[in-house]
């Protein structure tokens, strides 16, 4: 009798050991690397780029290249391109397309967060910029895969943007009504203060929208011709917008 009980105990110990080994093997399997992404995010101020870009960064482990923030960062760090750009801006000029494209190239080559791809935000704004960007990416054998446009009526944008709050360091955006931070005027991630931009008022926005539409319609046409453009209704709830973006990206 004791022999049978001993055998049962041995079998149970072996089964437990097998279970431990299987669990250990699973834990050592390398985590799945997300699919890479190379895209442009197009949309007027207030369309939700600052809300959706962090979702894309987290989903694809890619870098968010908001060109305005990138330009400010390069100037602050006094990189060769930043120094050159500052001279132009101090003289009241516009930073050239070549400088902006080279800044993007620099980020792709030196920013470790860009290893799995990038989300470009705020560039290109003209067809010559789009062509220069395509040339640079072709040289690097990293062509754009998607251009996603967040589409939204202007009148809704005015309501949205006048309540917008921004975390300056990261570019994360919130809204007092539609997407409030957990704590009033405080960034959810860092605990740092949020700000409301001085140009986030109705009159300033309407002027920016006129400029945006004039610039962007040709860009949308450019990417439609190349076959990588997709449009998303950005007037929906942010979670629904996110789901539609993933569909555009084949997820």
Curated annotation (Swiss-Prot):
InterPro entries: Adenyl_kin_sub (IPR006259), Adenylat/UMP-CMP_kin (IPR000850), Adenylat_kinase_CS (IPR033690), Adenylate_kinase_lid-dom (IPR007862), AK2 (IPR028587), P-loop_NTPase (IPR027417). GO terms for cellular component: cytoplasm; cytosol; mitochondrial intermembrane space; mitochondrion. Gene3D superfamilies: P-loop containing nucleotide triphosphate hydrolases. GO terms for molecular function: adenylate kinase activity; ATP binding. GO terms for biological process: ADP biosynthetic process; AMP metabolic process; ATP metabolic process. Its EC number is 2.7.4.3. Residues 163-200 are annotated as: LID. AMP binds at residues 67, 72, 93-95, 122-125, 129, 197, 208. ATP binds at residues 46-51, 164, 173-174, 236. Disulfide bonds: none annotated. Keywords: ATP-binding, Cytoplasm, Kinase, Mitochondrion, Nucleotide-binding, Transferase. CDD domains: ADK. Its main location: cytoplasm. It catalyses: AMP + ATP = 2 ADP. Residues 66-95 are annotated as: NMP. It is found in: Cytoplasm, Cytosol; Mitochondrion intermembrane space. Monomer. Belongs to the adenylate kinase family. AK2 subfamily. NCBIfam families: adk (TIGR01351), PRK00279.1-2 (NF001380), PRK00279.1-3 (NF001381), PRK14527.1 (NF011100). PANTHER family: NUCLEOTIDE KINASE. This is Adenylate kinase. It comes from Yarrowia lipolytica (strain CLIB 122 / E 150) (Yeast).
């Amino acid at each position: 009798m004791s022999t049978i009980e001993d055998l049962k105990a041995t079998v149970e110990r072996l089964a437990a050991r097998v279970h431990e080994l299987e669990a250990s093997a699973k834990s050592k399997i390398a985590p799945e690397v997300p699919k890479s992404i190379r895209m442009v995010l197009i949309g007027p101020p207030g369309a939700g780029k600052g809300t959706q870009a962090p979702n894309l960064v987290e989903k694809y482990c890619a870098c968010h290249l908001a060109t305005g923030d990138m330009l400010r960062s390069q100037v602050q760090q006094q990189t060769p391109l930043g120094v050159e750009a500052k001279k132009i801006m101090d003289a009241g000029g516009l930073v050239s397309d070549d400088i902006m494209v080279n800044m993007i190239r620099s980020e792709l080559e030196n920013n470790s967060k860009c290893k799995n791809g990038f989300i470009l935000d705020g560039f290109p704004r003209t067809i010559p910029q789009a062509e220069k960007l395509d040339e640079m990416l072709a040289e690097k054998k990293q062509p754009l895969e998607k251009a996603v446009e967040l589409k939204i009526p202007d009148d809704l944008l005015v309501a949205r943007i006048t309540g917008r709050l921004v975390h300056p360091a990261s570019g994360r955006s919130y809204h007092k009504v539609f997407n409030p931070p957990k704590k009033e005027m405080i960034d959810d991630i860092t605990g740092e203060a949020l700000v409301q931009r001085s140009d986030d008022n109705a009159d300033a926005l309407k002027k920016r929208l006129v400029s945006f539409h004039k610039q962007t319609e040709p860009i949308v046409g450019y990417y439609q011709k190349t076959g990588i453009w997709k449009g998303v209704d950005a007037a929906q709830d942010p979670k629904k917008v996110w789901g539609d973006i993933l569909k555009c990206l084949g997820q």
